[in-house]
Amino acid sequence: MMTSVSNDRCRGAREKPQMPTAHAAQSQKQVVQATAEQMRLAQVIFDKNDSDFEAKVKQLMEVTGKNQDECIVALHDCNGDVNKAINILLEGNSDTTSWETVGGKKKNFGRESSENKENREKRTEREASRGRGTNNRKGRGGNRVREFKGEENGIDCSQGDKPAERGKRARGRGFGRGRGRGTGRFSAQSMGTFNPADYSESMSTDGCGTKLAVWEAAQNGTDEGPEGLAKSHSMSQEPPSKSSYGLKGAWKNSVEEWTTEDWTEDLSETKVFTASSAPAENHVTPGHSIDLVALLHKPAPPTQATEVNSFETSQQQGFGQALVFTNSQHNNQMAPGTANSTSASSYSPQSLSSVLGSGFGELPQSNMVNISNSQILDKLKPPGLSPFPAASSAQQNDTASPPATTAAWDLKPSAPQPSVLSRLDFKSQPEPSPVLSQLSQRQQHQTQAVSVPPPGLESFSSLAKPRESTAGDGPSTVSRLLQLPNMTVENIVSAHQPQPKHIKLPKRRVPPASKVPVSAVEMPGSSDVTGLNVQFGALEFGSEPSLSEFGSAASASENSNQIPISLYPKSLSEPLNASFPMTSAVQSSTYTTSVVTSSTLTSSALSSTSPVTTSSSYDQSSVHTRIAYQSSASPPDSAPGSVANGHGGGRSQHTVDTTSSVPAPKKTDPSALPSVSTLPGPASCTALLPSSAQHTATLPSLTPAAAELSSSPLSQLSSSLSGHQNSMTSAHATRSTSTPHTHASVESTASSAAFSAAATSAPSAPSSGVVLPGSMSTVSSLCLGGTTVSVPSSSTRATALVTSGKAPPNLPQGVPPLLHNQYLVGPGGLLPAYPIYGYDELQMLQSRLPMDYYGIPFAAPTALASRDGNLANNPYSGDVTKFGRGDSASPAPPTTPAQAQQSQSQTHHTAQQPFLNPGLPPGYSYTGLPYYTGVPSAFQYGPTMFVPPTSAKQHGVALSTPPTPFQQASGYGQHAYSTGYDDLTQGTAAGDYTKGGYGGSSQAPNKSTGSGPGKGVSVSSGTGLPDMTGSVYNKTQTFDKQGFHAGTPPPFSLPSALGSTGPLAPAAAPGYAPAPFLHIMPAHQQPHSQLLHHHLQQDAPSGSGQRSQPSSLQPKSQASKPTYGSAPYWTN
């Protein structure tokens, strides 16, 4: 909807701006002046610029790869704006529906009366000046568009200078039309115009969220009520909306980070915006808090009216509900600002309320985010949003680390916090356990989240500050926090259990959310989660009791956590502090996303883990651990958040929420947890609680180890984990093992979960890979607990990965877990380079690699012999038979012979014409180990294995040798055509074959000047290989070679690959021979260009440079036929 609408908007905006003016001015002339739409249709029907349009369409098709129809539609939707059309097509914002509905009639309806239009225009202007719709839509680029939109769409009607007229219009027309269009009109106009063009980041959210919220609310049947509300609160709401816009803008950016397209899709498909939009309406005067709440409630239209009408009640009830529902929806919108959102979710009532009340660091955004957090958490949880994983992570950070949120509150809302707290207290506190429970349960990390909120409730300001101090204080602050959380946890736990229903509600939102996280979340869910579930199931969560115990266990755990904090403060504390403070700072400002997402995440990741461990240490940590595990993707983000919050668990919880793609887990931490993470709270709780005690006991022992967590704690934790975690062990075991570690583990697990599927190392391995990152060294070992032990290093990278919250994408770099198996030698990294290359790639590389001593010489002997006329056959003749030169010295017959022979094959090799050199078989079999090509540097035949490509490569390699190119052409073309070879050999035959392209080329030396270039071209034209061939190529061979070798890499001129000495300068050849692997790797890793450049240099000089590759060929070729090699051929 959004997409189509947005396009509508885009086009409509353009057209409408024209039309409204025209209509307003010419309302009487409406008939006279065709609507913009009509005009457009007429143009479409009769296109004077048909050629232009076709050109545009072609351009679009080329750029976007879409089919003609799509491109045409996009072009029409974009009013012929190719760039916009490209953006729309690439962004997946198809205006197809919008475009269809954009008809002038609706616009006409919008402009039913010229008076209305005029009034509307005036109103729009007024409002714009007033800073209402248009100004609010500043971000959307909306003043100009907005005016027309408002006028045409009656969007501004609710605002209205003419409330009655406007209201009627807006309601009747705007809403009616909106409804008629399925709110598409408003959405389309508000969101559509800018959305496709991305006029402004916050446009869709702002326009859609706020404006649309109102309209949608009206459309939702709250037309008049919401409209009235909108009218009454419109102004007040709008400004908050604006703030929200700011948030949303930031959020949108975040979302873009989270894959805005996905979200757009989800929102559009899910019509989350509908609820979302209505909530915008709900942005009532209550202030940012209300805005947030309204936004939160937006997702839940039912609660919207209530919330708007009585935000307080709404907040209390709606908070749970709205948060729950809103969470889902806002998760979508707010995901970007998830960090805060999550944290709100975590301790949704308190955090949310406070955050909402406080307005977070950035009141609108933060508030929104916080609420969103819960919403997001809900959403994340049920859907197990992967896109939000980062957001989730961030959210989890928030959740996990109210401190982050609190920090933000501290920074900004500290003062407001008291009120927020009171507000929270009346809402969150009374509601908190319910709401928090709901949220918590939904969020799986509720316990943690709840724990956190209690501290937050206790005093968000103080909490925030303590949390901030937690970074430094860690233990003491954590103790407070943890202890509070323990109390809260217990309360929450009880409340927590009731909350499942809320979770379910979010589930309905799940589809959009889950849609995004499918890969990230599902992977853990499907592979790890299943295994984990089994494990955890076996593990016995004792979920319910566990949770209850969890609270008490949390105390012990928290103590342990405190210990870990102390420990971490030692090792992680610094990072923790750094990240923590950072988190606090971030929290205060960007905290939601940025902290969670990366800086905090990365730096926090380690510290996060420890903080997570610390704060997670309380049962929630375990409960959420599983959740975190599930949320794995999110967890990484959350981890930092957790750290920041000092509630590792919270963060983990967040992760859990994210992970808790299994909505059930969210609902029921205990039962769901097992299913969701299995690691989940129950497992953690049960095992953890008991283990918590154990951990408490163990942790003390571990505590020392904790400092060394990486190694000894790992074993210790492993031990505890073993008993404790069982299969859950690694990731979850770690988690359970020590609350702190558990959290680290959880965080790791969360990360792992994020990567979990990716990091298949083990159920825990995934966690280890990603999850460990948070814990990094300490937790990493811990988390690795077994599976992830290796992950620690990886884990570090994982941290970064986690930071992104999309571990899998990041995995490749730092996380071998996913990929190392792919590499021949994942860990070694040596062979892996080769595995990187395919046969073709190797061929390509080889062509670039300095020619082996044998590589070209082989080609030279045969090729030169046959090519005598063309290239200096002397070197090759000599080379083949003798090691006359260093270059040809290698009896390079094997490899180069393939090439040379192929060249000759072109020439005389027609008979010979084995794609593989005769020597190839031995080389072939030996070279069968192309990766060991370096080994047989002396082995002439080794390279031949790839000779067939070699000939191609040789062409490329012996770029200097016209034969090479021709060989290639002939080798490929003529090889295919036996006659071709003969023809090539004979200038005439070649001429016949290639029409002088090859013949000339083959005999290029003879006809090189005349034919060389042309031949090269001809060859390329006539033969597939000609690119490489022809004087043109020889001349350009440095590049062509690269290109060719890339295109048709010489098979394996193993000499190059082998590093045989060969055409490369003899000295270079030895160097290469010794480091063939290196060369191949460098060629591949570095661009092939370096090697290529080698060759290129070698080749490009044709004489000297070429010498390296065809070395003997080239120099001699130059010598023998300076014309061909030097002037004509190379010049050509």
Curated annotation (Swiss-Prot):
GO terms for cellular component: chromosome; cytoplasm; nucleus. Disulfide bonds: none annotated. Residues 341-351, 436-448, 602-618, 631-644, 713-722, 897-914, 1101-1115 have a biased composition (Low complexity). Residues 8-17, 109-130 have a biased composition (Basic and acidic residues). The modification Phosphoserine is found at residues 433, 440, 631. SUPFAM superfamilies: UBA-like (SSF46934). It is found in: Nucleus; Chromosome; Cytoplasm. InterPro entries: TC-DDR_regulator, UBA, UBA-like_sf, UBAP2/Lig. Pfam families: UBAP2-Lig. Residues 48-92 form the UBA domain. Signal peptide: none annotated. Keywords: Chromosome, Cytoplasm, Methylation, Nucleus, Phosphoprotein. Residues 233-244, 331-340, 392-404, 619-630, 652-662, 723-742, 1116-1132 have a biased composition (Polar residues). The modification Omega-N-methylarginine is found at residue 166. Residues 168-182 have a biased composition (Basic residues). Residues 1-29, 95-202, 221-248, 331-351, 380-479, 602-679, 713-749, 875-919, 996-1033, 1040-1059, 1087-1132 are annotated as: Disordered. CDD domains: UBA_UBP2_like. Recruits the ubiquitination machinery to RNA polymerase II for polyubiquitination, removal and degradation, when the transcription-coupled nucleotide excision repair (TC-NER) machinery fails to resolve DNA damage. May promote the degradation of ANXA2. May interact with ANXA2. This is Ubiquitin-associated protein 2. It comes from Mus musculus. The gene is Ubap2.
